Each structure stands twice: as C-alpha cells, then as structure tokens.
Design a protein with these regions (language model features):
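Electropositive
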Residues: 1-69, 141-158, 173
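Compact, glycine/acidic-enriched structural inserts
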Residues: 82-84
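Mid-sequence acidic-hydrophobic segments that form the walls
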Residues: 63, 87, 91
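OB-fold single-stranded nucleic acid-binding module
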Residues: 41, 90, 94-197
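Alpha-helix boundary/capping detector
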Residues: 46, 86-87
Length: 197
C-alpha cells in the first residue's frame, strides 16, 4: 500500500487495486496537478481523468474503494473528495462496510498507532502553547489521544477563518496517521483533516 514495502497491506486493498486496474489499465489518462507534483516517496500527486471525463479519484471514492488522504501543499479538490467519501461511508459502500475502516473512537486510538485512521471524539481541552495548538480528548494529556497543530500549519487554519484553540467541547472528525508521543497523537497539517461536527 502507498507504494511502501514496509507498510502492511490493508483490508480491501486487493479489491480496490483490481477495480482501479479494470477502470484505467490500457486506457489513455490525463493527469492534472494542483500543487506539489511528487511526494517524498517519489509518487506522482495528480488527479487522473479518462477520455470520457471520468475523474478517477472521484469514482474510487464514490464506490467506497478509497479514503481521502490529502497533503498540506496539495489540497486541490479535497472538499469534493471528502463529500464523495462521506456519501460512500454513509452507504457503507465498499471498504466502509469493513470493520477495519470504522470511524475510531479516541479511547481506542492507542491500539492503532502507526496507522492512518479517522477518529471521532469530543474535545475536552483546547489550548495554545508556544504557538502550537493541542486538542486533548481525555483527562490526562500525557496518555490520552491528542491532536496537535504546529504554528506553521496553524496559519492555514487562520487563512480559512478557523481558530481550533476555541473548539473546546466540540465534537470533531480528524483524519491522519496516529503516532505515539505522550499517548496516541495525530499531527494535523491542514484544515481539511478536521471536520467540526
């Protein structure tokens, strides 16, 4: 998955790959870029379009064959992709019918460190310390799930008119890689990773 040998294959990966191959293999595709063209692993960051106008990423999301994974410096069409993903999730289409892809409760996030997840939880405490925002979801920030936003990334939130440090008590859906730093944590790099519910 993700073109990296050390990442464990996720459930439904083979079905998604087979569907993508049926859709595009042997066909001419047009690439459209919307920011950085290559990621740090050397993969092209492009939207694919078939001759008939089919937007490949949109089709995959609509069929429940993919999740939205966006980048700070390449956010083109992310809003449209999130809407398609949400619709497929609501219908339990494709991978959304698999337990592995269920939206995670913050209390269980420690079990899925080093995986990309969607986590839904209510913010217990929202603070800004030395320019960094911490959204805490439990009584002990040293061991409970936390979302962080660096000063650099916080500027994107400001440009979008968002102030995450004021979200205490709000329920959110956050997406990203869970890492371990004083408990399970997601470092958010851009506003599209968080939806205030």
């Amino acid at each position: 998955p993700l073109g990296r040998d050390y990442v464990k294959k996720q459930p439904f990966a083979d079905q998604s790959k087979a569907a993508l191959e049926r859709l595009v293999l042997g066909k001419v595709v047009r690439l459209s870029y919307g920011g950085r063209r290559v990621d740090r692993h050397g993969r092209a960051l492009a939207h694919l379009h078939l001759k008939d106008g089919t937007w490949v990423q949109g089709w995959l999301l609509e069929q429940g064959l993919a999740r939205v994974y966006s980048f700070r410096d390449n956010r083109t069409r992310v809003a449209a992709m999130l809407a398609l993903e949400e619709d497929a999730r609501r219908r339990k289409e494709g991978l959304w019918g698999h337990r592995y892809y269920s939206i995670l409760d913050a209390a269980r996030s420690h079990k899925l460190v080093d995986t990309f997840q969607l986590v839904r939880a209510r913010i217990k405490d929202a603070v800004r310390i030395k320019g960094r925002v911490y959204l805490n979801f439990g009584a002990d920030w040293r061991k409970d799930f936390t979302v962080t936003i660096s000063p650099k990334n916080l500027r994107l939130f400001g440009k979008a008119g968002l102030r995450p440090e004021t979200w205490q008590g709000h329920e959110i859906l956050v997406r990203g890689w869970i890492n371990w730093r004083n408990g399970p944590m997601i470092d958010v790099t851009h506003p599209e990773q968080i939806e205030v519910l």
